[in-house]
Amino acid sequence: GAVHSVVFAGFSAAALSTRINDCQCEIVITSDGSFRGNKILNLKKIVDDALNDCPQVSSVLIAERTKSKIELKSGRDKLLNNLIKNASDSCSIEIMDSEDPLFILYTSGSTGKPKGMVHSTAGYMVGAGYTFKNIFQYQNNDIYWCTADIGWITGHSYIVYGPLLNGATTI
């Protein structure tokens, strides 16, 4: 399994490169842009600027969300839609140990250098699945929505993992 690290889309290129280098990231997944109020953030440009200081990154996968004009770096950048078109419908599973790392989320850095918090596979998933089901009183056939940002632990837990672990329909 691939350990992932989601970062807040509003970070600067410097903040992004610090986190990429700290966790020794080799692949970045981003989108062409993101909506913030009535503005479009050029996420691909922020990633490109960040990667000037991240020589270990070999691939950037880009989702075309805003359809903003972007530059693709030959040999490194790939559009997700093109990859998905040619992808197999099946994928063999990777058996993971319960203590294997699942993801890294970074602290805000408000009290110093941001620290990468490593979350293990089973402990985190049991907690996220249980708290989603019981705190939000999720029932089969409910439609669920969470306003948090996916780059923070609440969004990670209750936009992604908790709903997936409970088979929830999300908006």
Labelled PLM ranges:
Residues 60-63, 73-106, 113, 123, ...:
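Conserved pre-ATP/AMP-binding loop-to-beta segment of ANL
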Residues 15, 20, 26-29, 99-100, ...:
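Hydrophobic, small-residue-rich alpha-helical packing segments that form membrane-like cores
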Residues 1, 47, 162-164:
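Short hydrophobic alpha-helical segments of the AMP-binding
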Residues 3-82:
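Structural core segment of the AMP-binding/adenylate-forming
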Residues 120, 125-143, 151-171:
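Conserved AMP-binding/adenylation subdomain of ANL enzymes
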Residues 8, 148-153:
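Conserved AMP-binding
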Residues 4, 27, 144, 170-171:
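A short hydrophobic/small-residue beta-strand
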Residues 1, 110, 167:
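Conserved G/P- and acidic residue-centered "switch" motifs that form tight phosphate/ATP-binding loops
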